[in-house]
Amino acid sequence: MESWSRCLERLETEFPPEDVHTWLRPLQADQRGDSVILYAPNTFIIELVEERYLGRLRELLSYFSGIREVVLAIGSRPKTTELTVPVDTTGRLSQTVPFNGNLDTHYNFDNFVEGRSNQLARAAAWQAAQKPGDRTHNPLLLYGGTGLGKTHLMFAAGNVMRQVNPTYKVMYLRSEQFFSAMIRALQDKSMDQFKRQFHQIDALLIDDIQFFAGKDRTQEEFFHTFNALFDGKQQIILTCDRYPREVNGLEPRLKSRLAWGLSVAIDPPDFETRAAIVLAKARERGATIPDEVAFLIAKKMHSNVRDLEGALNTLVARANFTGRAVTIEFSQETLRDLLRAQQQTIGIPNIQKIVADYYGLQIKDLLSKRRTRSLARPRQLAMALAKELTEHSLPEIGDAFAGRDHTTVLHACRQIKLLMETETKLREDWDKLMRKFSE
């Protein structure tokens, strides 16, 4: 049930993910018209869910799919046949069921926070939405780490297509759903109907195509679906967690097709964009937080938008629960464990290893006294990344680089910032390395 999956994903940004995994993911959702039955294995879980989560579950299920009633029950979901696309008995797309293609209307271009790291991707998605099927951006491939806004832009483009032309048939699927639908069609001997469903839409949006790696039959079917849509000038928008040519297990001919249109990277947001995202998400929730709190979260959380949103949700939830004002002190206290975990994830040794591997060096090369250009530039870049991604002081960073003086670190940071304005290759290296830390 698609709306239940989206509900769980949203809840993981509002509550501790381990709590969602423990108490909510074991539930089995069964939709009956405008009602949903959530089956739990025992009374204890039902009582806990009812006390802690039921109100929010009702809100989200109503938002995602118009569900009016949510019921908790002990047992297991009955076996049912799930249709991914509304079809009639002839295999044509049903004209009696409003076609929304699993689009989440919450995501649009207005609530997407634009920054240097994503402005090209936003512009590309907007163009695809305005001129679907145009060969300059068909297919449109958005790639980058988790939680950087790829799916947001995909939904936003699909929603604009539907706004411009309400009869436009836009289908959004995660790659796992495409795979599951194909497996069901093989089992039911209904592959012809499966193919017609996808060939008769106006735009196809598929998330996380790296999931296709190693699945030969799935790639075969997607290859033919891609060709049919492309030849018919229907828009294709895809996302991937990395540049497709770097995905092992994707067939060369599929990689070639993906390169026909426009491929755009989304990088981790810089500090200013992170702060703007926190403030925008707070406004969406109707919460008011001081700028300095947004700056605190932006400075401490570097990896992706989901982490920023998770920190904000934790902060707002505790403020509402305790009735306390959101101050710097309150924020540091509330987010202490979360921020500590973030810092432990990205440490200077980790940065040194990733930079050394990226340039084909050894860590001892970065720490050596040699000043050849092939070593000096990666060393400076590693120092600048340590300044950007950790809370270590300049002297501490210098100590980690074989006892270098803090002025050396400061010079490296300034030099990298200056050179990135003119050297495209260095800027690309910086962006690629930042993406590695968001994975």
UniProtKB/Swiss-Prot annotation:
Keywords: ATP-binding, Cytoplasm, DNA replication, DNA-binding, Lipid-binding, Nucleotide-binding. Residues 320-439 are annotated as: Domain IV, binds dsDNA. Residues 102-319 are annotated as: Domain III, AAA+ region. Residues 75-101 are annotated as: Domain II. SMART domains: AAA (SM00382), Bac_DnaA_C (SM00760). GO terms for cellular component: cytoplasm; plasma membrane. GO terms for molecular function: ATP binding; ATP hydrolysis activity; DNA replication origin binding; lipid binding. It is found in: Cytoplasm. ATP binds at residues 147, 149-151. Belongs to the DnaA family. This is Chromosomal replication initiator protein DnaA.
